């Protein structure tokens, strides 16, 4: 199988998981180091997607990578939710299968891969934003942003600071200093799916060691009012509390847009706390739950067989790889797993502003999939 085919297989697995999973709710992972919360508001569909991933390479010399990412499907275009699914799953698969050494370059290449995938599918009529922060086990930190989703850093001494720039016409024309820009100035000039000319540049995070939280927010979250948004983040006791409060306020004031928060605690032991049983392990966490992938290659070995295995061919595509190099996806276990402590409490739909402010913990399903690439010798 070619490298491109291998990446497409990982992308389709993540994309299917997101597409068929729940879209609204919240999840915490890594002993409180990662929090994702998403609310539909009064919209018919939640077109926001957010995930946390980390991958351990099969090659020992390559560092492990962790990343938190958010995509907001553009509702005024075709298939906003599907565009967000395709954008974030392509970004994730490109990031974890990329071979370039520098983290910043891998983020840029993964962003361009997502852009081209969405453009090819929707021909410029569908799109999404993208905000992501990533780190490696060697201590590298980098971020990237396209569109008007935002990336903030929270440092106790300095409060909340936006480190991304909204890709709007208003910002491009900021030198005009218009007192109250008309709505057309707030339109996006860059988005995932626009095709050629994206030219996304990574954001350097040289002082990452001073950061407490990296905060990713869709526009439905931060537009509740800048002072209110900043006040909630700055005065919340925990990151999850902050995320849920922002989404609740968004719903209380009308819920005119989806609201999604994804927060990464920089102090979390993202790599030492995760000890996968197999090399090549990829973990993806999102509102649907937790997806575990084991990705590795085998040469001249027969297909794995198991009476309980759910084995199927890779999805057919027009540009499918040549025959003779089969790929097996084996569903090796389905079990309930969660970092939340209460495994009996039901999930609460946080899009309902009249519900109790106490957000009950709940358990999400974990799907373990082993992807084995079998090559002829």
Feature-to-residue mapping (PLM):
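PP2C/PPM-type serine/threonine phosphatase catalytic domain
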Residues: 1-377
